C-alpha cells in the first residue's frame, strides 16, 4: 500500500478500502458459520483488523506456491478461529480455499476443517486447535529460520530470511505449553518471531476475571520478550501497523504485541460475550450485524474493489519467488556445497545411499544398551543428513541424544545442532513439530525418558496428525531402568502409542534393529517415530537385521524342518527379545520345534501383505507366547485367544532391574512354562 497523507483523497479512499476489506473477512466468517450452523465466529470478527494488516501489508508469500521456501510463516495458535485464516487465504488468491470451500466449513471432505490442518489446506503451516500447541510450533518455525540462516546465509547472499508471525488468545496464554515455548524463544533470541495476542478478555466460561488475572505483558517481559501494546485492535489500523513495524526492528528478542480486541466485534447483542465464541450468531443477529456494520452484500460476497486490491498478491508473490530463485542460482554458483545442503533441506531429498552410513553389528559385537546404540546411529545419520537437529529435555547424558560433531544451538551460536530444551517436554514436542514442518529436509529429534511422554503426549499426537517426521528418542523404556521405581517405569506407554494413528513405535532389541529403526524413522517422511530404548545392556542377537525391522516383524530363528510348521511361536520386542530367544533354545533342548519372532514394530508389520504375515505367524500355529516388559494390552492380536502374553499389568517398583524382572515373572523360565502349557 502506498504511503499517503491522511488528509489526501487517496488516503481516505485507502482507509475506506481497509475497512471494507476487514469487514469482508468478518462476514466471510459469519456467513461460513451460519451456513453450517457450527463454528467460532467471534475470534475472526475481533481479529480481522490485525489479520488484514498482517497479511495484506507485511507478510511475503506466493499464493500460487504455498510452499515457497522463503515465505513468511503464519500460525493461528487459537485454531478455533480458523475462518480468519481461511478468509485471508481466500482473499489472497490461494487455490486451496475457494468460496465452495468456505461454504463447506467443518464438513466431510472439505479443505476447511474445524481447526487448521497443514495436510488438508495448502497455506496452513501447522496444525493447531489444542490451545498453546501453535505457540510451540511457531517457536519451532522461528528456530528453524534462525538456525538455517546462520548456517547458510553469506555476507553477499541472505537466502534464509523470513519472519514467523502468530496470533494467540487468552486460552493459549493459560496453557503451560505456551510458557515453556515462550521461555525458550526468548532464551534463544528468536528476533524474527512476532506474536499478536488477541487480548479480548473472554473465555468459554465467561470473562477472564474468573480465572486469569495475571499481567501477561509483565510475564513476557520477565521471560525476555519485547512487549508492545495496541490499545485499539478493533479499528486502530495505524496502531497495529506501527506495532508490527517496531516489532520487526527488534532483532535480538521475540516480540509480543498485546492487541486489545472485542470478540464478535460488530454484533449488536453478542459482541464482548462468551456466547459469540463457539456458536453461530443466528439469522437475526447476523442480519443485525450487517445493518450495524453497513454491509449490504449477499452472503460470501467479496466486493470487486476488495478483490482487485488483494489480487496483487498473486503477481507480487510470483515476483518475490522468482527473484529468490534467481538469487539462489547465483548462490549455487558461488557456494556449491552450502547450496547443495540447503537444497536437500528445502526438498527433503535424501542423499543417495545415505543408509550405508549406519553402523553394522554382528553377534560378536559388544553388548550395549539400545540407548547407547541409538547414540551411535544418531551420530552416523547426522554425518550424512544436514537437516538432523534436536536434543533432550534436560536428560542429554541419560538419553545419549546429542551430536558429537556439533555445538549447542544458543542465542549467540545458532549454527549448533544440539538443542537444550531444559525440563520442558511439552514445549519440546511442539517446537519439534514446527521444525519438522518448516522444511521437508529438517529432521528433528527429541529425547526424554519414555514415561515422560505423558508430559508431551498432546504434541506427539499433533505430530502424528500433522504427518510431521519427528524422531522421539525415548530411553529407560521399562522396569529395566531399575531403582528409580514406578514413577519412572513405563508400563502402559507402548500400548497407548500403538493405539495412536499414524505413528511408528519401534522397540529395537540390539544394534542391527536399532540401525533398522533409524532407517525407518528417516525414510518415513509422513509420520513420526518413537524409538523405545533400554537403559540396561543387551546382547547382539543372531538373526536380527535392518531389513527385518523394515517389515516390522520377522523370524530370527526357527529349528523346524523345511515344510514343517513350528510347534510354538515365541514373540518379543526390545529388551525381551533376548528372553524369547533364550527360552526358544531351552525348548529346543527338549526337542520342541520353536520359532522366535521379533515384533519390533506392530505398525509396520500390520502394513505387510497378508501372505507375509501368514508366513511369519502361520494361523494354524495357535501355541503362541509373547514377552514384553509392559502392559499385555493388545498382544491378543498376535497370540490369539489360546496364546499367552507374559508382561506387566500393574505399576512397577523400586529395586534392581534383575530383581524386578524376577518378581514380575519376565523371565526365560516363565516363557518356557507358558509355552509348555500350550504344546
Curated annotation (Swiss-Prot):
**One protein family per Pfam:** Transketolase_C_1
Binding-site residues for Mg(2+), renumbered to this chain: 170, 200, 202
Q: Which reaction does it catalyse?
A: D-sedoheptulose 7-phosphate + D-glyceraldehyde 3-phosphate = aldehydo-D-ribose 5-phosphate + D-xylulose 5-phosphate
Question: EC number(s)?
Answer: 2.2.1.1
Q: How does it assemble?
A: Homodimer.
- Induction text: By rehydration.
> What InterPro entries would the database entry show?
THDP-binding, Transketo_C/PFOR_II, Transketolase-like_C_2, Transketolase-like_Pyr-bd, Transketolase_bac-like, Transketolase_BS, Transketolase_CS, Transketolase_fam
Q: Which residues bind thiamine diphosphate?
A: 80, 129-131, 171, 200, 277, 425, 452
MF GO annotations:
metal ion binding; transketolase activity
Query: Could you tell me which PROSITE patterns the record lists for this protein?
Result: TRANSKETOLASE_1, TRANSKETOLASE_2
Q: Domain of life, per the record?
A: Eukaryota
- Give the record's family classification: Belongs to the transketolase family.
Which top EC class is given?
transferase
Establish whether keyword Magnesium is in the entry: yes
Summary of the function given for this chain in its UniProt record: Could be involved in the conversion of sugars, which are a major phenomenon in the rehydration process. Catalyzes the transfer of a two-carbon ketol group from a ketose donor to an aldose acceptor, via a covalent intermediate with the cofactor thiamine pyrophosphate.
**Primary gene name:** TKT10
Which cofactor does the UniProt annotation name? Mg(2+); Ca(2+); Mn(2+); Co(2+)
A GO cellular component annotation here is: cytosol
Q: Where does substrate bind?
A: 40, 277, 371, 398, 476, 484, 535
The entry's active site is: 425
Per the record, the GO terms for biological process are: pentose-phosphate shunt
**Disulfide bond in keyword set:** no
The annotated site for Important for catalytic activity falls at 40, 277
| Name used for this protein in its record | Transketolase 10
The cofactor note from the UniProt entry for this protein is: Binds 1 Mg(2+) ion per subunit. Can also utilize other divalent metal cations, such as Ca(2+), Mn(2+) and Co(2+). Binds 1 thiamine pyrophosphate per subunit.
Amino acid at each position: 500500500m502506498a504511503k499517503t497523507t491522511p488528509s489526501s483523497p487517496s488516503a481516505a479512499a485507502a482507509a475506506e478500502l481497509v475497512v471494507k476489506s476487514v469487514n469482508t473477512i468478518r462476514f466471510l466468517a459469519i456467513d461460513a458459520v451460519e451456513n453450517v450452523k457450527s463454528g467460532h465466529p467471534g475470534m475472526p470478527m475481533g481479529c480481522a483488523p490485525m489479520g488484514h494488516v498482517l497479511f495484506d501489508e507485511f507478510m511475503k508469500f506466493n499464493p500460487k506456491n504455498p510452499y515457497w521456501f522463503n515465505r513468511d510463516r503464519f500460525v493461528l495458535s487459537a485454531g478455533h478461529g480458523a475462518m480468519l485464516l481461511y478468509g485471508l487465504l481466500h482473499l489472497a488468491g490461494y487455490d486451496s480455499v475457494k468460496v465452495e470451500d468456505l461454504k463447506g466449513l467443518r464438513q466431510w471432505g472439505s479443505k476447511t476443517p474445524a481447526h487448521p490442518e497443514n495436510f488438508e489446506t495448502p497455506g496452513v503451516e501447522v496444525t493447531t486447535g489444542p490451545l498453546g500447541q501453535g505457540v510451540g510450533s511457531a517457536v519451532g518455525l522461528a528456530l528453524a529460520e534462525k538456525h538455517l540462516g546462520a548456517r547458510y546465509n553469506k555476507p553477499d547472499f541472505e537466502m534464509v530470511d523470513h519472519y514467523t508471525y502468530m496470533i494467540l488468545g487468552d486460552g493459549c496464554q493459560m496453557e503451560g505449553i505456551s510458557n515453556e515455548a515462550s521461555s525458550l524463544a526468548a532464551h534463544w533470541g528468536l528476533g524474527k518471531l512476532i506474536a499478536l495476542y488477541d487480548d479480548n478478555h473472554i473465555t468459554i466460561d465467561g470473562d477472564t476475571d474468573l480465572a486469569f488475572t495475571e499481567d501477561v505483558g509483565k510475564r513476557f517481559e520477565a521471560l525476555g520478550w519485547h512487549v508492545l501494546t495496541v490499545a485499539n485492535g478493533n479499528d486502530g489500523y495505524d496502531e497495529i501497523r506501527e506495532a508490527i513495524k517496531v516489532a520487526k526492528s527488534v532483532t535480538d528478542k521475540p516480540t509480543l504485541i498485546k492487541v486489545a480486541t472485542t470478540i464478535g466485534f460488530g454484533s449488536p447483542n453478542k459482541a464482548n460475550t462468551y456466547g459469540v465464541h463457539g456458536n453461530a450468531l443466528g439469522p437475526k443477529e447476523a442480519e443485525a450485524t450487517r445493518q450495524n456494520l453497513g454491509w449490504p452484500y449477499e452472503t460470501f460476497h467479496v466486493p470487486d474493489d476488495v478483490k482487485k486490491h488483494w489480487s496483487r498478491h498473486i503477481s507480487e508473490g510470483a515476483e518475490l519467488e522468482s527473484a529468490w530463485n534467481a538469487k539462489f542460482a547465483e548462490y549455487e554458483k558461488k557456494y556449491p556445497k552450502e547450496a547443495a545442503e540447503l537444497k536437500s533441506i528445502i526438498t527433503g531429498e535424501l542423499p543417495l545411499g545415505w543408509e550405508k552410513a549406519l553402523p553394522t553389528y554382528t553377534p560378536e559385537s559388544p553388548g550395549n544398551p539400545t540407548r547407547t546404540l541409538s547414540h551411535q546411529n544418531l551420530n552416523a545419520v547426522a554425518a550424512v543428513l544436514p537437516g538432523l537437529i534436536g536434543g533432550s529435555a534436560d536428560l542429554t547424558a541419560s538419553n545419549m541424544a546429542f551430536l558429537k560433531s556439533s555445538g549447542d544451538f544458543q542465542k549467540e551460536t545458532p549454527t549448533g545442532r544440539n538443542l537444550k530444551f531444559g525440563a520442558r517436554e511439552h514445549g519440546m514436542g511442539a517446537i519439534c513439530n514446527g521444525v519438522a514442518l518448516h522444511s521437508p529436509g529438517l529432521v528433528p529429534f527429541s529425547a526424554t525418558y519414555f514415561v515422560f511422554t505423558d508430559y508431551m503426549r498432546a504434541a506427539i499426537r499433533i505430530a502424528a496428525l500433522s504427518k510431521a517426521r519427528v524422531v522421539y528418542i525415548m530411553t529407560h523404556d521399562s522396569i529395566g531402568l531399575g531403582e528409580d521405581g514406578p514413577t519412572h517405569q513405563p508400563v502402559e506407554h507402548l500400548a497407548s502409542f500403538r493405539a495412536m494413528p499414524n505413528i511408528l513405535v519401534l522397540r529395537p532389541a540390539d544394534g542391527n534393529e536399532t540401525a533398522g529403526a533409524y532407517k525407518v524413522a528417516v525414510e518415513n517422511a509422513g509420520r513420526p517415530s518413537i524409538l523405545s530404548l533400554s537403559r540396561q545392556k543387551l546382547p547382539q542377537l543372531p538373526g536380527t537385521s535392518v531389513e527385518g525391522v523394515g517389515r516390522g516383524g520377522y523370524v530370527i530363528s526357527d529349528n523346524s524342518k523345511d515344510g514343517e510348521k513350528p510347534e510354538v511361536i515365541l514373540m518379543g520386542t526390545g529388551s525381551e527379545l533376548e528372553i524369547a530367544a533364550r527360552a526358544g533354545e531351552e525348548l529346543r533342548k527338549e526337542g520342541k520345534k520353536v520359532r522366535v519372532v521379533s515384533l519390533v514394530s506392530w505398525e509396520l508389520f500390520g502394513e505387510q501383505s497378508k501372505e507375509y504375515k501368514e508366513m511369519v505367524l502361520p494361523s494354524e500355529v495357535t501355541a503362541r507366547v509373547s514377552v514384553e516388559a509392559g502392559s499385555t494390552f493388545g498382544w491378543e492380536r498376535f497370540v490369539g485367544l489360546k496364546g499367552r502374553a507374559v508382561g506387566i499389568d500393574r505399576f512397577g517398583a523400586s529395586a534392581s532391574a534383575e530383581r524386578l524382572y524376577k518378581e514380575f515373572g519376565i523371565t526365560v523360565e516363565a516363557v518356557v512354562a507358558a509355552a509348555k502349557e500350550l504344546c
